[in-house]
Amino acid sequence: MTRQYWLRWFSLHGVPRVVLRVQSRKGDTFARMMGPEGIADPHPYIETIRSQGRLVKTPLPWVTCDHALVRSVLRDDRFGVRSSARIQIPKVLQRFANRVPPPANPADPPAMLRMNPPDHTAMRKPVVSAFTPRAVKKLRDTVETVTEELLDAMPSGGSIELVESFASRVPIAIIFDILGMPREDQEKFLAWGKDMTPMLDVGISRRTYGRAMQAAQSLNDYLDRHIEKLRREPGDDILSNLVQSGDLDHYALKANASIIIGAGFETTANLIGHCVSLLLRLPEQLDRLRAEPQLWPNAVEEALRYEPPVFITARQALTDLELEGVQLPQGSMVMLSLAGANRDPAVFTDPQRFDVARPNANEHLSFSYGVHACFGASLARMEATHAVRSLFERFPDMRAAAPPRLRQQLTFRGYAQVPVHLGRKVQVTPSTVA
């Protein structure tokens, strides 16, 4: 990592990392939730924060786990996402970090995750066209084909690790089709994505940040070549359309392509992993799905509620404002626990229970809300529903081979490994699992 990037890491992650450790030792609940204990099981910390009020002050940001308040902040145009920092840091460090531009990546401007209207609106509009319900419906055949190919390759009676061999493979194949990229390059992108997603966490290590920067640079180099190719030979895909439209400059094209790639497969892979792990752990819920297969879409909504692929997000006050009777000066950061909102007892009965028939499971906030709501939500739902149902119908005796292992990340919360014994393979026609 170059000296410039080391200083950027120090500004955005090094200082918060030290502060979080110090506050964790002092027993601060938020700091402990953001550390190794919280990654392993964040919910005791969430409930402690919830018991302290709807909006809770910590030594770093404000925090809320309240469903109504999280939803309100997400749609409030007095809040935005302009800061590159994930928690509040001194202005001098923020200014310095902004003077050291990183390779285009999903975590920094001009990526849509870090833009506000009207710039965000202008960048989002041409991308959303690839993810409308009508466009997603057209992708269903591709999702079914990719899923069946992966399941066909799995050995009857064998043991595999599902994240690497299945959960990540379905969404990356679909994203590659959307972006007009050759499938033989998927392995590179899976590796780059694995290294880059920690950039969205708080206080990552210097080594982790260095790997992320290397992956971001490799992705940039690839996208430079791919975008130039699309200028000469455009295809029938969203990235070709963006290149040919001229609406985005070259750097913005790369930043937003990296979002489509990263968010497009990382969140869906996490969702598939959570669905499989939950159903293996709770066989009575799987039995109900077998008896009532019409519940499969709702089961995916409940998995989104119970284990959201994105655990927490943040918003920054764009002006002096009042929230819950508290005066927040401009620049104040509010951490929004999507996982906490999704288990708010004011909204969900018996919220700590996973129930595939929960009548209001779809009231979760796992895909965010407001102007930054996930534009790929319909696609993620469709992919996960088909992939998970097909997996369990092809391998009805599948069971866990070992406890699943979580990634050491909190923002994008998912499994690094889900080892399973597949058991016998059953041949199922695509129409049966449609």
What function would you assign to each model-found segment?
Residues M1-A434:
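Cytochrome P450
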